[in-house]
Amino acid sequence: MKSTKTQPSPEREREPSFFQKLFGNLCSCFQDASIDEKPTYTPAKPVKKAPSVVQPRRVSRTLRSSESVHTNHGPERVFESPTPARTSISLESAISPNGTTNEQDIAQQGDMIDSHVHFGEQPTEPIDFADPPLPEVKRYGEGNWLLPPIAKEDEGKKCLILDLDETLVHSSFKYIEPADFVVSIEIDGLQHDVRVVKRPGVDEFLKKMGDMFEIVVFTASLAKYADPVLDMLDHSHVIRHRLFREACCNYEGNFVKDLSQLGRNLEDSIIIDNSPSSYIFHPSHAVPISSWFNDMHDMELIDLIPFLEHLARVPDVSTVLNLQL
């Protein structure tokens, strides 16, 4: 009996190759679409090149942070807000309304504070303390700038503005082990210890940045807390100026750091801050960084060094940092 071979029907499509199948699967995954019996192959769209090596990370963080914006109101807050989505703690929350303290109250409040700092939980019954009057901000020159004229040794350098809390350090009123150092501050006539942990790489970061930039620490924390912390942190004496809460603008309940008030050229000004609401006036001059609490494997400060070395040489930092969302 003579064997016959079945001829493929002219209407039948050619079986796709392995690479065609793989490409089709990838396309369907990215497009969130299921593959039919006759898959359709869509060519990949050209991707616009990111303007900097950290641009993808900057975009994702900005989008995540923009989902919620923190406000700064209520009782006095000694620390700066730990993250955009969380309200900062108050050291006064461990002091009873009549100005007295006891160990049990402090322990209970300490538990609440630690939970509040790390998880953004609001106290169920917040204690109402009036904010103290902030000191008058010292101004310089005819423009009433926040900073004095640039020093001779910093001429030709760009200005690097650094946030403090959750950017360079994490501070807690509750016991932290191990703490890098402890500062004592006075609240209503009583001394309270604040334990401070340094972000990994902060010493190397500050030393290298001091060679390339005029460094300014600009924090929304109170000076009575931030000043002693910076005294302990700045081993290399590279921080030229310190600005505190009174130098911030209060815009819709947020402490905003207005770079146009510093007295430095904007094209030469860069701010690194974990809170996007701090730089809402100048987002194209910002390098976002994640909020840091206790991850000792964090390397973001070290990772930023080569990028900032490049940024120190560009004519206008906004041409690199400007996000095209």
Swiss-Prot record:
Cellular compartments per GO CC: plasma membrane
GO molecular-function terms, A-Z: phosphoprotein phosphatase activity; RNA polymerase II CTD heptapeptide repeat S5 phosphatase activity
**Residue numbers bearing the Phosphoserine modification:** S52
Q: Does the keyword DNA repair apply?
A: no
Report if keyword Phosphoprotein is assigned: yes
Compositional bias of kind Polar residues: 62-71
Provide the protein name. Answer: Uncharacterized protein C2F7.02c
Q: Name one GO biological process term.
A: regulation of transcription by RNA polymerase II
